[in-house]
Amino acid sequence: MGGYSYGEATNSTELGGLVAKILFYDIETAPNLAYVWGQYDQNVVKQYREWYLLCFSYKWEGQKTTKVVSLPDFPEVYSEDPENDIAVVGALWKLFDEADVVVGHNGDRFDMRKANARFAFHDLKPPTMPMQIDTLKVARKYFMFNSNKLGDLGQHLGLGNKEATGGFELWAGCMRGDEKSWRGMKKYAKQDVDLL
């Protein structure tokens, strides 16, 4: 965050003589779908479909390139069921299992808990639990920025802003299988990790 460096390595960092593999990551999910009787102040009558992972972006400390893993990256699974996130979840599980430290913005409250929920759903044993650094918590605890939103922090610290999405339509387009939407989602997800 903001020019703070953890050292130079290909995918690990030396901390007091120990080598730590540090993973920066972010996930994007599809929304829950439900039946409702109205638009405002409504209870869900029945849930139609639960959320799932659309994609995740990641970069190892010391690497320049941020990668994105998404549902269409697994065409055999995706063509059979475009909502089946088993391959994406499995790829994320492997990274978590390899990492000593994971870094995400609001990762403790959202990304890690959502990831753990999908690991459990797919009967994956918990990965070797890495140490977590939540940059939102770090910003709140050690600094007094006007805003702790990732895009605002990135802009304030000269790292850039979040990628514009155009709103919910980007997520809806991905759920419909629209290739342009998937390109936009990957660009959006990549930028979130680049801001970390």
Protein language model features and the residues they cover:
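Short, motif-level signal for alpha-helix interfacial/capping segments enriched in acidic residues
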Residues: 4-7, 110-113, 170-171
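Acidic active-site catalytic centers that drive phospho-/nucleotidyl reactions
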Residues: 26-28, 111, 134, 192
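Acidic, Mg2+-coordinating catalytic module of metal-dependent nucleases/exonucleases
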Residues: 103, 149-196
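Conserved DEDDh/DEDDy metal-dependent 3′-5′ exonuclease domain
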Residues: 62-156
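Acidic two-metal-ion nuclease catalytic site recognized across multiple nuclease folds
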Residues: 2-10, 14, 187-196
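Conserved RNase H-like, two-metal-ion catalytic cores of nucleic-acid enzymes
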Residues: 4, 11-97
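Short hydrophobic "helix-edge" motifs at membrane interfaces and signal-peptide entry regions
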Residues: 16-19, 124-125, 181-182
